[in-house]
UniProtKB/Swiss-Prot annotation:
EC number of the protein: 5.3.1.24
The protein's name: N-(5'-phosphoribosyl)anthranilate isomerase
Lineage, highest ranks first: Archaea, Methanobacteriati, Methanobacteriota, Archaeoglobi, Archaeoglobales
Enzyme class: isomerase
UniProt keyword annotations, A-Z: Amino-acid biosynthesis, Aromatic amino acid biosynthesis, Isomerase, Tryptophan biosynthesis
Keyword Amino-acid biosynthesis: yes
The organism's place on the tree of life at top rank: Archaea
Organism: Archaeoglobus fulgidus (strain ATCC 49558 / DSM 4304 / JCM 9628 / NBRC 100126 / VC-16)
Gene: trpF
InterPro entries: Aldolase_TIM, PRAI_dom, RibuloseP-bd_barrel, TrpF_fam
Protein backbone atom coordinates (compact mmCIF):
# COMPACT_ATOMS: atom_id res chain seq x y z
CA UNK A 1 0.00 0.00 0.00
CA UNK A 2 1.50 3.31 -1.09
CA UNK A 3 0.91 6.39 1.03
CA UNK A 4 1.07 10.00 -0.13
CA UNK A 5 0.91 12.84 2.37
CA UNK A 6 -0.03 16.01 0.55
CA UNK A 7 0.29 19.70 1.29
CA UNK A 8 3.67 20.15 2.97
CA UNK A 9 4.53 23.83 3.40
CA UNK A 10 7.90 23.85 5.14
CA UNK A 11 11.08 21.86 5.63
CA UNK A 12 9.90 20.97 9.13
CA UNK A 13 6.69 19.45 7.74
CA UNK A 14 8.65 17.71 4.99
CA UNK A 15 10.94 16.15 7.59
CA UNK A 16 7.93 14.78 9.48
CA UNK A 17 6.43 13.34 6.29
CA UNK A 18 9.38 11.91 4.38
CA UNK A 19 10.35 9.64 7.29
CA UNK A 20 7.22 7.55 6.75
CA UNK A 21 5.36 8.29 3.49
CA UNK A 22 6.18 7.07 -0.01
CA UNK A 23 5.26 10.36 -1.72
CA UNK A 24 4.40 13.89 -0.75
CA UNK A 25 3.00 16.94 -2.51
CA UNK A 26 3.42 20.71 -2.50
CA UNK A 27 0.48 22.87 -3.54
CA UNK A 28 1.23 25.71 -5.98
CA UNK A 29 -0.86 28.11 -8.04
CA UNK A 30 -4.05 27.31 -6.17
CA UNK A 31 -6.51 28.92 -3.77
CA UNK A 32 -5.70 26.25 -1.17
CA UNK A 33 -4.64 27.38 2.30
CA UNK A 34 -1.67 25.02 1.82
CA UNK A 35 -0.44 26.83 -1.28
CA UNK A 36 3.23 27.88 -1.32
CA UNK A 37 5.22 30.10 -3.65
CA UNK A 38 7.10 28.43 -6.50
CA UNK A 39 10.52 29.15 -4.97
CA UNK A 40 9.45 27.47 -1.73
CA UNK A 41 8.14 24.51 -3.71
CA UNK A 42 11.48 24.23 -5.51
CA UNK A 43 13.33 24.16 -2.18
CA UNK A 44 11.02 21.47 -0.79
CA UNK A 45 11.26 19.36 -3.94
CA UNK A 46 15.05 19.68 -3.99
CA UNK A 47 15.34 18.79 -0.31
CA UNK A 48 13.04 15.77 -0.29
CA UNK A 49 14.26 12.18 -0.09
CA UNK A 50 10.92 10.94 -1.52
CA UNK A 51 9.13 11.90 -4.76
CA UNK A 52 7.23 15.20 -4.54
CA UNK A 53 4.20 16.07 -6.66
CA UNK A 54 3.60 19.68 -7.63
CA UNK A 55 -0.14 19.93 -6.96
CA UNK A 56 -2.15 22.62 -8.72
CA UNK A 57 -5.46 23.73 -10.14
CA UNK A 58 -3.57 25.26 -13.08
CA UNK A 59 -5.62 24.51 -16.17
CA UNK A 60 -3.31 25.20 -19.11
CA UNK A 61 0.01 23.87 -20.32
CA UNK A 62 1.44 27.41 -20.21
CA UNK A 63 0.75 27.60 -16.47
CA UNK A 64 2.19 24.16 -15.89
CA UNK A 65 5.22 24.99 -18.02
CA UNK A 66 6.03 27.78 -15.56
CA UNK A 67 5.51 25.43 -12.61
CA UNK A 68 7.82 22.81 -14.13
CA UNK A 69 10.50 25.37 -14.94
CA UNK A 70 10.45 27.13 -11.57
CA UNK A 71 10.09 24.08 -9.30
CA UNK A 72 12.05 21.49 -11.33
CA UNK A 73 9.44 18.91 -10.36
CA UNK A 74 9.26 15.48 -11.97
CA UNK A 75 5.72 14.73 -10.79
CA UNK A 76 2.55 16.77 -11.38
CA UNK A 77 -0.87 16.41 -9.77
CA UNK A 78 -3.61 18.05 -11.83
CA UNK A 79 -6.81 19.27 -10.17
CA UNK A 80 -8.46 20.86 -13.20
CA UNK A 81 -10.18 19.99 -16.44
CA UNK A 82 -7.26 20.81 -18.71
CA UNK A 83 -7.74 20.76 -22.46
CA UNK A 84 -6.73 17.29 -23.61
CA UNK A 85 -3.99 18.60 -25.90
CA UNK A 86 -2.41 20.51 -22.99
CA UNK A 87 -2.68 17.46 -20.75
CA UNK A 88 -0.93 15.29 -23.34
CA UNK A 89 1.92 17.82 -23.53
CA UNK A 90 2.25 17.75 -19.75
CA UNK A 91 2.29 13.93 -19.73
CA UNK A 92 5.19 14.02 -22.17
CA UNK A 93 7.19 16.15 -19.72
CA UNK A 94 6.55 14.58 -16.29
CA UNK A 95 4.67 11.79 -14.54
CA UNK A 96 1.10 13.02 -14.07
CA UNK A 97 -1.50 12.13 -11.46
CA UNK A 98 -4.95 13.40 -12.41
CA UNK A 99 -7.58 14.00 -9.76
CA UNK A 100 -11.13 12.91 -10.55
CA UNK A 101 -13.94 14.12 -8.31
CA UNK A 102 -16.14 11.24 -7.20
CA UNK A 103 -19.66 12.40 -7.94
CA UNK A 104 -22.20 10.66 -10.09
CA UNK A 105 -21.98 7.11 -11.46
CA UNK A 106 -18.70 5.23 -11.83
CA UNK A 107 -19.15 4.96 -15.60
CA UNK A 108 -19.16 8.75 -15.96
CA UNK A 109 -15.85 8.99 -14.09
CA UNK A 110 -14.43 6.00 -15.98
CA UNK A 111 -15.13 7.80 -19.26
CA UNK A 112 -13.04 10.76 -18.06
CA UNK A 113 -10.26 8.45 -16.91
CA UNK A 114 -10.21 6.81 -20.34
CA UNK A 115 -10.19 10.21 -22.03
CA UNK A 116 -7.25 11.62 -20.07
CA UNK A 117 -5.40 8.32 -19.48
CA UNK A 118 -3.10 9.76 -16.80
CA UNK A 119 -0.07 7.94 -15.44
CA UNK A 120 -1.74 7.84 -12.00
CA UNK A 121 -5.39 8.19 -10.96
CA UNK A 122 -6.55 10.02 -7.83
CA UNK A 123 -10.16 9.63 -6.69
CA UNK A 124 -11.01 12.59 -4.49
CA UNK A 125 -13.92 14.39 -2.87
CA UNK A 126 -12.85 17.82 -4.07
CA UNK A 127 -9.84 20.08 -3.57
CA UNK A 128 -8.93 19.77 0.08
CA UNK A 129 -12.50 19.36 1.30
CA UNK A 130 -11.50 16.98 4.09
CA UNK A 131 -14.70 15.00 3.47
CA UNK A 132 -15.21 11.43 2.33
CA UNK A 133 -17.19 10.52 -0.77
CA UNK A 134 -19.20 7.50 -1.90
CA UNK A 135 -16.69 4.68 -1.56
CA UNK A 136 -18.99 2.38 -3.53
CA UNK A 137 -18.15 4.41 -6.63
CA UNK A 138 -14.43 4.37 -5.83
CA UNK A 139 -14.57 0.63 -5.24
CA UNK A 140 -16.11 0.05 -8.66
CA UNK A 141 -13.38 2.14 -10.27
CA UNK A 142 -10.60 0.46 -8.23
CA UNK A 143 -11.72 -2.88 -9.66
CA UNK A 144 -10.85 -1.56 -13.13
CA UNK A 145 -7.92 0.76 -12.49
CA UNK A 146 -5.06 1.19 -10.07
CA UNK A 147 -6.16 4.19 -8.03
CA UNK A 148 -5.08 6.40 -5.17
CA UNK A 149 -7.93 7.14 -2.79
CA UNK A 150 -8.26 10.57 -1.17
CA UNK A 151 -10.91 12.63 0.55
CA UNK A 152 -11.45 12.79 4.29
CA UNK A 153 -9.07 9.98 5.18
CA UNK A 154 -7.75 9.88 8.74
CA UNK A 155 -6.52 7.49 11.41
CA UNK A 156 -10.04 6.37 12.20
CA UNK A 157 -11.16 5.39 8.70
CA UNK A 158 -8.09 4.57 6.61
CA UNK A 159 -8.16 0.84 7.37
CA UNK A 160 -11.86 0.61 6.55
CA UNK A 161 -11.32 2.61 3.36
CA UNK A 162 -8.53 0.30 2.20
CA UNK A 163 -10.45 -2.87 3.05
CA UNK A 164 -13.55 -1.67 1.21
CA UNK A 165 -12.18 0.19 -1.82
CA UNK A 166 -8.92 -1.77 -2.28
CA UNK A 167 -6.90 1.06 -3.84
CA UNK A 168 -3.22 0.78 -4.67
CA UNK A 169 -2.53 3.87 -2.59
CA UNK A 170 -4.04 6.44 -0.26
CA UNK A 171 -3.56 10.20 -0.12
CA UNK A 172 -4.03 12.27 3.02
CA UNK A 173 -3.62 15.90 4.05
CA UNK A 174 -5.85 17.34 6.77
CA UNK A 175 -6.20 13.89 8.36
CA UNK A 176 -2.60 14.08 9.62
CA UNK A 177 -2.63 17.71 10.70
CA UNK A 178 -2.79 19.25 14.14
CA UNK A 179 -3.49 22.99 14.29
CA UNK A 180 -3.04 23.22 10.51
CA UNK A 181 0.41 21.62 10.46
CA UNK A 182 1.54 18.12 9.55
CA UNK A 183 2.06 16.22 12.80
CA UNK A 184 4.78 13.56 12.81
CA UNK A 185 2.97 11.26 15.25
CA UNK A 186 -0.22 11.40 13.16
CA UNK A 187 1.72 10.81 9.93
CA UNK A 188 3.56 7.84 11.42
CA UNK A 189 0.38 6.25 12.75
CA UNK A 190 -1.57 6.88 9.54
CA UNK A 191 1.15 5.22 7.47
CA UNK A 192 1.39 2.31 9.90
CA UNK A 193 -2.35 1.67 9.76
CA UNK A 194 -2.46 2.02 5.97
CA UNK A 195 0.43 -0.34 5.36
CA UNK A 196 -0.86 -2.93 7.82
CA UNK A 197 -3.93 -3.27 5.59
CA UNK A 198 -2.22 -5.15 2.78
CA UNK A 199 -4.11 -4.96 -0.49
Amino acid sequence: MMVKVCGVKSLKELDAVERYADFTGVVVKSDSKRCVELDVAKELIGSSSIPVFAVSTASSYAEWEEILAKTECSFAQVHSEMPLEDFERLKAEVKVMKAFIVEGPAEKIAAKIELYSPHLILLDSGCGSGKTHDWNVSKALAERYGVFLAGGLNLDNVREAIRFVRPMGVDVSSGVERDGLKDEMLVREFVRRAKNEVR
